[in-house]
């Protein structure tokens, strides 16, 4: 059973976050290992496995990028284990330029303001790419959606690096 079915959703990108959380709590209550303390060992093990699957499914479906990766995996695009790399040279050059820009920010006199501006720019890029990915997933354009997810992974890492720099600057 796939994660969408487990939570009673159709296998598509759009998931109601509130409903997901409510169904997660219901499933947790239903399969919590404490409810199976007096059950035979086989039943306890099955409950533990089911609880683990429920937790994994929830973590996957609640995170937009993980949800997209999972949906693609259901359609034959295993992005997490693939050896394919991005072939979009312009995007890769843009990423290298952005990373260089981020490295230089730390040493600027106006690092706080520059970092805020940089962070806003990256957030806008993520927003645009996410909208494109959602449209591709809705249209079942799986190869294009997979490419967008690969690009969003780069941007996600860049956002994480930006947050780490912000924490370092605040700690100074």
UniProtKB/Swiss-Prot annotation:
One of its GO terms (cellular component) is iron-sulfur cluster transfer complex. PROSITE patterns: DNAJ_2. SMART domains: DnaJ. Keywords: Chaperone. One of its GO terms (biological process) is protein complex oligomerization. Residues 2-74 form the J domain. It holds the Pfam family HSCB_C. GO terms for molecular function: ATPase activator activity; protein-folding chaperone binding. InterPro entries: DnaJ_domain (IPR001623), HscB (IPR004640), HscB_C_sf (IPR036386), HscB_oligo_C (IPR009073), J_dom_sf (IPR036869). Interacts with HscA and stimulates its ATPase activity. Interacts with IscU. Co-chaperone involved in the maturation of iron-sulfur cluster-containing proteins. Seems to help targeting proteins to be folded toward HscA. Belongs to the HscB family. This is Co-chaperone protein HscB. It comes from Edwardsiella ictaluri (strain 93-146).
